[in-house]
Curated annotation (Swiss-Prot):
Strychnine binds at residues 236-241. Gene3D superfamilies: Neurotransmitter-gated ion-channel ligand-binding domain, Neurotransmitter-gated ion-channel transmembrane domain. Disulfide bonds join 171-185, 232-243. The gene is Glra4. It catalyses: chloride(in) = chloride(out). Glycine receptors are ligand-gated chloride channels. Channel opening is triggered by extracellular glycine. Channel opening is also triggered by taurine and beta-alanine. Plays a role in the down-regulation of neuronal excitability. Contributes to the generation of inhibitory postsynaptic currents. CDD domains: LGIC_ECD_GlyR_alpha, LGIC_TM_GlyR_alpha. Residues 1-27 form the signal peptide. The alpha subunit binds strychnine. It is found in: Postsynaptic cell membrane; Synapse; Perikaryon; Cell projection, Dendrite. It comes from Mus musculus (Mouse). This is Glycine receptor subunit alpha-4. Glycans are attached at residue 71. Detected in the retina inner plexiform layer, especially at the border between layer three and four (at protein level).
Amino acid sequence: MTTLVPASLFLLLWTLPGKVLLSVALAKEDVKSGLKGSQPMSPSDFLDKLMGRTSGYDARIRPNFKGPPVNVTCNIFINSFGSVTETTMDYRVNVFLRQQWNDPRLAYREYPDDSLDLDPSMLDSIWKPDLFFANEKGANFHEVTTDNKLLRIFKNGNVLYSIRLTLILSCPMDLKNFPMDIQTCTMQLESFGYTMNDLMFEWLEDAPAVQVAEGLTLPQFILRDEKDLGYCTKHYNTGKFTCIEVKFHLERQMGYYLIQMYIPSLLIVILSWVSFWINMDAAPARVGLGITTVLTMTTQSSGSRASLPKVSYVKAIDIWMAVCLLFVFAALLEYAAVNFVSRQHKEFMRLRRRQRRQRMEEDIIRESRFYFRGYGLGHCLQARDGGPMEGSSIYSPQPPTPLLKEGETMRKLYVDRAKRIDTISRAVFPFTFLVFNIFYWVVYKVLRSEDIHQAL
């Protein structure tokens, strides 16, 4: 009995260190495994699991495939509103285009962050809407210093895609009131391949869908605050496609056209009236002034049309230029009338001399029938009282009337008439032009402007 107790005690003491070491080793392994389980997944591993080859995500298939259409919410931030060109009827704009939609396949829980900002190169790995600008003439992306694109994925599967674009968009213009017009330019966002059964565009409702950079100014226009948002669904042979649009209202500023067109043409018309105060005998001065103003006005009118498209209707600037040209041409014709009237006395006196000469010839022929002195019969003629009639008394023409005095009177009469034309023109031309100006500006700046504002 005594020999068995020491043996068992010896066995216990021999195996105890091994058990302690084994317990410590197992405890270390448990601690390591616990720490490894609580450590978050690396971003690379997470992205590979979310949209990599092993994730089963296919960027060629839209979300909710064979289910309800994908709703894409759009909003635009305008960085700059470039030149509006009348000849080509387009405008240039630089924008941030933002699209947001939900892709349930990209929802996650494994990563602690609420959203992930991804590199633009990841755009090729996910599905994107096939948005294009229906009225686009030209566009380009921006790649300085890197691709101006943003991709953000949220925890619930929402995707935010933002891109910076410079666009040249078509803008059909109505130039009847040019340069006192208000143009409405549209921007249409449309799906290229997905019909409305697969994709729907809509404007952002929680915040302004179209924002403009603070302090944005245009050289010739004022961009009005009212921006009409709407839908422009397109129907083609291939189906019905979603489309949304925004309308920008651009009110033209007249400062440039007042300085370059209206005021110069106004001064040319006033300059043509100077000829009314120049002596009518100074024909070179008056004719030269008239022709110069006509040619200058013609050049001015041609210059105003050079920067505008060739349209079939009459514009406000065309009416102004045509009337100004008519006034300067009328001033030139006025001198032609004055010169013609002032020379009428010469024609009158020439006619009077011709008539007098004809009467004298008729009198000579009539009286010569009774003049027979050359035939020796003069002593046979008797007067009414019975006495003989001398041959010299048979024809005694009356003394000629003083034509010189009559000519001077007629010359003064017609010259006074010509001067009266100049005097009347000095009042009629400015008054008529003033009436035209009142009518012109009231119609285009008041009446038509109110009609345009009501239509908007």
